[in-house]
């Protein structure tokens, strides 16, 4: 089992020193879901929400969140992201919105937290914009789908998960 990288020998939290690591292309994808009543989802799909375009706002929020992950999550490195993408898809058959984020850079540390933050904040933005209509929406699950690049190797969620 791997050791926790953000805990030093004395058991104290610390920021990992990545200065000796090689720069590689790193990429991560994450997903989140927001489940709601069919009427709420229909309002988002047909664009009749009084606050405007819910998907456009959530997309921008997710992109902005990825860029600011280092300010939100202690011990994360500030990263020079080369790409952030947030896709939102209505899934009427499940009364939910699926959010998928992609983050990429060439650097010394991974972008998993940025991808997870992008998907999470996009989901929170959907909730915020729709809470006047429905307060019992459910956010989740939120998970890492894949990562590539770096010393720890590649990871991909099993297609059956």
From Swiss-Prot:
What domain of life is recorded for the organism? Bacteria
Q: Which UniProt keywords apply?
A: Lyase, Molybdenum cofactor biosynthesis
Annotated GO molecular function terms are:
cyclic pyranopterin monophosphate synthase activity
EC number(s) per UniProt?
Answer: 4.6.1.17
Please name the top-level EC class of this enzyme. Answer: lyase
* Residues involved in substrate binding: 75-77, 113-114
Q: Does the keyword Membrane apply?
A: no
| Reaction catalysed by this enzyme | (8S)-3',8-cyclo-7,8-dihydroguanosine 5'-triphosphate = cyclic pyranopterin phosphate + diphosphate
Record-level GO BP terms: Mo-molybdopterin cofactor biosynthetic process
Identify the metabolic or biological route this protein is part of.
Cofactor biosynthesis; molybdopterin biosynthesis
Please list the residues that make up the active site.
128
Q: How does it assemble?
A: Homohexamer; trimer of dimers.
Function summary: Catalyzes the conversion of (8S)-3',8-cyclo-7,8-dihydroguanosine 5'-triphosphate to cyclic pyranopterin monophosphate (cPMP).
What's this protein's family per the entry? Answer: Belongs to the MoaC family.
Name of the molecule in the record: Cyclic pyranopterin monophosphate synthase
């Amino acid at each position: 089992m791997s050791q926790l990288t953000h805990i030093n020998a004395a058991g104290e939290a610390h920021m990992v020193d990545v200065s000796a690591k090689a720069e590689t292309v790193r990429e991560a994808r994450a997903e989140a879901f927001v489940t709601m009543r069919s009427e709420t989802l229909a309002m988002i799909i047909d664009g009749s929400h009084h606050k405007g375009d819910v998907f456009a706002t959530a997309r921008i929020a997710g992109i902005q969140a990825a860029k600011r992950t280092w300010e939100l999550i202690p011990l994360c490195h500030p990263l020079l992201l080369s790409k952030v993408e947030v896709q939102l898809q209505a899934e009427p058959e499940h009364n939910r919105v699926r959010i998928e984020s992609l983050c990429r850079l060439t650097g010394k540390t991974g972008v998993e937290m940025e991808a997870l933050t992008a998907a999470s904040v996009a989901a929170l933005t959907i909730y915020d914009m729709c809470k006047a209509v429905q307060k019992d929406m459910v956010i989740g699950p939120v998970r890492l789908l894949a990562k590539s690049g770096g010393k720890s190797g590649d990871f991909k969620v099993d297609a059956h998960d």
